[in-house]
């Protein structure tokens, strides 16, 4: 059985880890980095992922996708999506089913399809390290992701060619990474996870006893649309406003300028975590009739903190709710762990310290802990890690819509999973022959205020007065937090069930088609790689041949020289095209035309070899007459 890898599919950065010699190891990608920007770009002939995609974003803003995780499993009309529609340089559109999709070069794409490109890179990184094919993974999601978002993440894995063995919550993964080596005792840990696009707080009890470890999530809460991207956007808007005040031009209307502004804002934010002031200097940011314009703005740490103060305060309310749900007070928390790149901001650390009354731990890498935890969970599933039990929870309550548009809960939030629950309902009208089971997720009493996960009908109910038929509804949540629902007429035994699969917005057929497309692209990518290889070999041969022609000088007959130059010209022309066979044919023709050059080079080598041999003999004869001399080493202090 191959290795199961652990992947942190992040909003801003992603990371992959594997168990290596019993320890979780974070892997370096092809660029030599341990984290990969979650950025995907589409050009005329290829898909670019990670740092290379980030580098070209300024010149290709409309087809470069970042923070795609904020759209995964969401509806286009959601308030959070509408906010992003107005600030993202790329196009966010409504799919036929009402989901939020993106568009690039006329192609409409589902967020899981785009996210799959990042997962493919993580998969390839692991395969390069392990030297074998990888087909299974544990993928992390924010603890507060709903059923749709979890299912969409699983779909992304399938499209990338991975069987997702488990979906694990990010704070839980971080707690695994922190607690796996801890000795005896019972610890209650608060994991504050402020990433690029999402915020989670989880209260986790770690019980270590005689080599056995139990990680039990007591409560979780959060906001799936609050993270570092929002901090960046505050700074971007501030810079755009300052420029407008000074120059009278609105950079928000220029996608290229906004992409440069985004890069600069992100860089400035990072710098202000270690310095009190920085300068954003962007020459030639735009131009008008009077000429080019430059943006130069000084930003202090205090200014940045004032811009994002309300965002930091927004993270504190979920902390209070999670503690209340776990029936704990601040004094019950033994350790605080910070996860996610945005927690490097001193003001965030200060807010967390003030809330919990203790310093967060500094020995957990906020960028890598989640991937490490995913790799440990992968080890648990494969049997490589023993004596570890992970008890996670469902973050939101689950129920159905009942008479009066009320949500009736069957499973309360923070229930340990996997779990089952059942309840008997009845009809609302006399002689009702069918009931609609409308499945909801959320905490509101009003059904319409919660997230609709799907609905199905149970028909064939025998005519009877209202309230008489007995319809048993069963909810079953698996270890990934994904829901299966069934409804049974207890009198007839007729049953109808639904796995909330299409809640990701993609039908089984659509996912299967995307898997096929991804496989086809893999073949395309392979062909493209082979084409580039042929081009490189051809270029190298032309370069070497030119050098040999120069070195041969007059020794090369003019007729042969003309043939070689014509062959080189043919190679240079072929290299500009996309026909691999034509390039290889032209390359072979050049090799054959250069036969005379090879003869000249060999003759020259033999001549030089003979001369060197004669010189060596002369040198040896002289050496026989040499007498060794005594010597004394002169120390520096004697000089």
Curated annotation (Swiss-Prot):
Acts as a chaperone. The gene is dnaK. GO terms for cellular component: cytosol. This is Chaperone protein DnaK. The keyword Phosphoprotein applies. Residues 625-639 have a biased composition (Acidic residues). Belongs to the heat shock protein 70 family. NCBIfam families: PRK00290.1, PRK05183.1, prok_dnaK. Keywords: ATP-binding, Chaperone, Nucleotide-binding, Phosphoprotein, Stress response. CDD domains: ASKHA_NBD_HSP70_DnaK-like. GO terms for molecular function: ATP binding; ATP hydrolysis activity; ATP-dependent protein folding chaperone; heat shock protein binding; protein folding chaperone; unfolded protein binding. Pfam families: HSP70. SUPFAM superfamilies: Actin-like ATPase domain, Heat shock protein 70kD (HSP70), peptide-binding domain. InterPro entries: ATPase_NBD (IPR043129), Chaperone_DnaK (IPR012725), Heat_shock_70_CS (IPR018181), HSP70_C_sf (IPR029048), HSP70_peptide-bd_sf (IPR029047), Hsp_70_fam (IPR013126). Residues 603-639 are annotated as: Disordered. Induction: By stress conditions e.g. heat shock. One of its GO terms (biological process) is chaperone cofactor-dependent protein refolding.
